């Protein structure tokens, strides 16, 4: 079974990372958290320590179905500054693989990969200038082919549900949403 990987860097937005992992695991998706540093403990933007499942060096891109980047500052900047991660995302994207980013991550991570068309995206307000090639939308979550973007923390669950729907079905995503009392 292919896996989804959610990447963590110091300063990640806790709600966007852990909320998405929770939604996907409720939908029985195998999702692994991945530290981009040489240690598994990563500290969120609000001081919450998290122990990642894997280190970036442990990830085989060929096993990936979805590569997911949460936002948060300076977490999203740290993800975008990680050359090995950006190269992995580029390779995955070039093969038609799914990528997802929320908050500042579309601007600070996805802006670093070469895309073959003008994608419709959203991001945290004020970061749009980093995505001059994208068609920006004010929506909370935007799905455009194999790219899913989210606006920020308030949309973390909807972002996770959009990923879940791509991986499974609308029915599974609706069942998970109902179980979480989401409208």
List PLM regions with ranges:
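Histidine-anchored nucleotide/phosphate-binding helix
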Residues: 21
């Amino acid at each position: 079974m292919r896996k989804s990987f959610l990447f963590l860097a110091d300063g990640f937005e806790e709600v966007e990372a852990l909320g998405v992992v929770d939604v996907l695991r409720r939908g029985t998706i195998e999702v692994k958290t991945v530290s981009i540093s040489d240690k598994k403990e990563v500290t969120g933007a609000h001081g919450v320590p998290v122990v990642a499942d894997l280190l970036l060096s442990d990830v085989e891109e060929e096993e990936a179905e979805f590569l997911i980047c949460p936002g948060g500052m300076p977490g999203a900047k740290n993800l975008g500054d990680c050359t090995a991660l950006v190269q992995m995302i580029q390779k995955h994207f070039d093969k038609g693989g799914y990528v997802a980013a929320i908050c500042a991550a579309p601007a600070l991570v996805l802006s670093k990969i070469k895309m073959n068309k003008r994608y419709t995206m959203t991001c945290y307000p004020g970061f749009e200038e980093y995505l001059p090639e994208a068609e920006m939308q004010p929506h909370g979550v935007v799905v455009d082919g194999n790219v899913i973007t989210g606006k920020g923390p308030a949309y973390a669950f909807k972002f996770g549900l959009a990923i879940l729907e791509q991986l499974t079905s609308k029915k599974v995503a609706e069942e998970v949403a109902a179980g979480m009392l989401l409208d």
